[in-house]
Amino acid sequence: SSAASDVYKRQLMMGLTSNLCLYDVFSPEGVAEEMRQCGFDGVNITATTDVKEAFTDAKYIISSGGAPRKAGMTREDLLKGNCEIAEQLGKDIKTYCPDVKHVVIIFNPADLTGLVTLLYSGLKPSQVTTLAALDSTRLRSELAKHFGVSMDVVENCRTYGGHGEQMAVYASTAKVEGKPLAGMIG
């Protein structure tokens, strides 16, 4: 996915790694070639469709391996298929790289796919995270617009659940210009 590709490019730009293995059940060679053409010095980029090759002795995994949402689908519609993908991911981690340091899940619904990956991988909760800050960032942006302030003065915005009608907002933690949101919205 482009989100994963962006994360990989940032890692290379920051010098966090010189070895990168791209794995996909469909050939990731096109993405690998695009990254090679970015001209990062001293970087080894491998592309493979073989999970054993990709995961054996991996130290960090960033997975965007879920199916994308199609027109008319809700995020909840993605749940079954993407949780099956997350289950297999967890099993593959347990088999090929049980000593992985950290896994980041960036496919939806991230809260559940992250949990499923965690349960099947045998890893500790501190070793599996999701990139799910989008909703909190959107909340922060909307509050800033609503109150006519900069996003810099909107703090501690937290949400829970997938970004849909079931999502909850923690109004008790959010602050706008240091004032509790709960007191501002009545």
Regions inferred by a protein language model and the residue ranges of each:
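Short, small-residue-biased leader/transition segments that mark boundaries at the very start
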Residues: 1-8
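Short, well-ordered alpha-helices that flank and scaffold nucleotide-derived cofactor binding pockets
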Residues: 9-13, 33, 37, 91, ...
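Conserved S-adenosyl-L-methionine
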Residues: 13-18, 125
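Conserved N-terminal Rossmann-fold NAD(P) cofactor-binding segment
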Residues: 16-58
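Rossmann-like NAD(P)-binding element
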Residues: 40-102
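General beta-strand structural signal in soluble alpha/beta enzymes
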Residues: 47, 63, 105-106, 127-130, ...
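Rossmann-like NAD(P)(H) cofactor-binding subdomain of soluble oxidoreductases
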Residues: 74-142
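Active-site-lining helix/loop region of Rossmann-like oxidoreductase modules
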Residues: 126-186
